[in-house]
């Protein structure tokens, strides 16, 4: 059940947020083209034991666009500013897809704000994606979203529904901009979640895990790595949204609640 909704004025942006449940704070960062409700059953599942603060990025859903390009770093700064306004000094963070990239940037740019990270279906560098994913990004058009849940959600919630082509173009530019982040510099432990048929290459997810201290023979190690990796069977990129039961259980165990 949604207990609160509102807008935070951050960095010239009126950023929409929802608060569900009670307990220790857990920030949920949705994927590209997504509103909070498109996260499906995950937010209610996590809100059973946590105070979930779910946001919508610039140009997404209830959050109107402004004259500013999209970037992972800027979205992370917006989220950090929202937490500051809410009086939340530190929180756990769950990010899916685009939100996973923002979560990584939040951990790198604002380490004091982040206790633990959950990175779902995201990469730390642009070469982590399958080539066909990049090809799809290059050829994407607004018309491809006609009749989809993403377009329907935008039309239902956006202050200016006619701005959808602008959203597509800005996300296209973001997606096609190369990046490579030093994930080994993350201070927060991370749970990496990926589908076995996701858009991010499995080798990339394993490499991320290794960069965070994973990939050891645990039975002979002094202790298990602080970060963890889970590969979800029979799961695609979009299909991660249908795995709320699996994911919420793993997230709860990792966060210790």
Task: Briefly describe each language-model feature range.
Residues 13-64:
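Conserved HGGG/HGGXW glycine-rich cap/lid loop of the alpha/beta-hydrolase fold
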Residues 32, 91, 95-100:
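Conserved alpha/beta-hydrolase "nucleophile elbow" surrounding the catalytic nucleophile
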Residues 44, 194-235, 241-246:
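Conserved loop-alpha-helix segment in the C-terminal half of the alpha/beta-hydrolase fold
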Residues 101-109, 115-151:
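Flexible "cap/lid" loop of the alpha/beta hydrolase fold
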């Amino acid at each position: 059940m949604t207990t609160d909704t509102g807008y935070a004025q951050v960095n010239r942006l009126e950023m929409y947020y929802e608060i569900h449940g009670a307990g220790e704070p857990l920030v949920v960062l949705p994927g590209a083209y997504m509103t909070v409700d498109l996260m499906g059953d995950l937010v209610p599942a996590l809100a059973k034991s946590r105070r979930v603060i779910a946001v919508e990025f610039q140009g997404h859903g209830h959050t109107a666009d402004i004259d500013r390009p999209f970037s992972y770093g800027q979205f992370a700064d917006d989220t950090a500013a929202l937490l500051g306004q809410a009086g939340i000094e530190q929180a756990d963070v769950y990010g899916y897809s685009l939100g996973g990239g923002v979560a990584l940037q939040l951990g790198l740019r604002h380490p004091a704000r982040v206790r633990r990270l959950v990175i779902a279906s995201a990469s730390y560098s642009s070469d982590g994606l399958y080539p066909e994913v990049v090809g799809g990004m290059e050829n994407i058009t607004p018309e491809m979203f006609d009749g989809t849940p993403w377009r329907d959600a935008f039309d239902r919630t956006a202050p200016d529904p006619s701005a959808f082509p602008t959203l597509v173009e800005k996300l296209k530019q973001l997606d096609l901009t190369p990046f490579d982040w030093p994930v080994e510099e993350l201070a927060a432990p991370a749970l990496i979640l990926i589908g076995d048929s996701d858009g991010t290459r499995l080798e990339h997810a394993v490499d991320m895990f290794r960069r965070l201290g994973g990939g050891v023979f645990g039975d002979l190690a002094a202790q298990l790595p602080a970060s963890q990796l889970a590969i979800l069977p029979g799961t695609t990129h979009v299909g991660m949204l249908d795995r709320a039961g699996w994911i919420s259980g793993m997230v709860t165990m990792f966060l210790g609640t």
